[in-house]
Amino acid sequence: MLQVQHENHFFLFNFDENRPNQEHFFESYFWQKQNRIIGSAKGRGTTWFIQSQDLFGVNTALRHYYRGGLWGKINKDRYAFSSLEETRSFAEFNLLNRLYQAGLPVPKPIGAHVEKLAFNHYRADLLSERIENTQDLTALLPNTELTAEQWQQIGKLIRRLHDLQICHTDLNAHNILIRQQNNDTKFWLIDFDKCGEKPGNLWKQENLQRLHRSFLKEVKRMRIQFSEKNWADLLNGYQN
């Protein structure tokens, strides 16, 4: 792990030695100039997909942190600064690294960037592994049913996360990815912004109910194939 400061910019990298141009790794135009941009996705902002297998061992996704909701129309990307460890990018990087090292299927974090601004504010970016050849469940389920075993796999994955006392505060069908290849199915969890460790057990049931509501919402919105039998299978995997 390497932490570097350059003027008002702070960097955290998942490698041990300085690399050429590392302070530019969080600038999309740096990658565009090298013809390494291989795609993008729109959300609150643009997530850029980068061909970086030769540099980091994985292709990557570059994301700038933006605010949502009404407040985001006034202040799109500035956050109050208290400490580096509590910034959005450093916190998500460190959590992903902890989960990745524990063997959970999450994106490998590659780098985090914080730009300190006037009046004790900051902007932030995250560079992490792009999980390729996958779909999120809302893209798959309108046309495909999951088996009971696959729903149980999802339940087991969430249980592994909860057993580490990690609460995914935005656990929903969009943040579960699936890859099906050669009769093998694997699931990933993504988007750990504002997530973290939480003591006790009461919150775990609430977290599961959040996911349940997400599936029910997508039944109406995206017409996904989901039933209470599927949910029972997921819970069976979680409990066993």
Swiss-Prot record:
The keyword Cell membrane is assigned to this record: yes
GO cellular component: plasma membrane
GO biological process, one term: lipopolysaccharide core region biosynthetic process
Keyword annotations: ATP-binding, Cell inner membrane, Cell membrane, Kinase, Lipopolysaccharide biosynthesis, Membrane, Nucleotide-binding, Transferase
Coiled coil: none
Known EC number: 2.7.1.166
Location in or out of the cell: Cell inner membrane
Protein name: 3-deoxy-D-manno-octulosonic acid kinase
Organism listed in the record: Mannheimia succiniciproducens (strain KCTC 0769BP / MBEL55E)
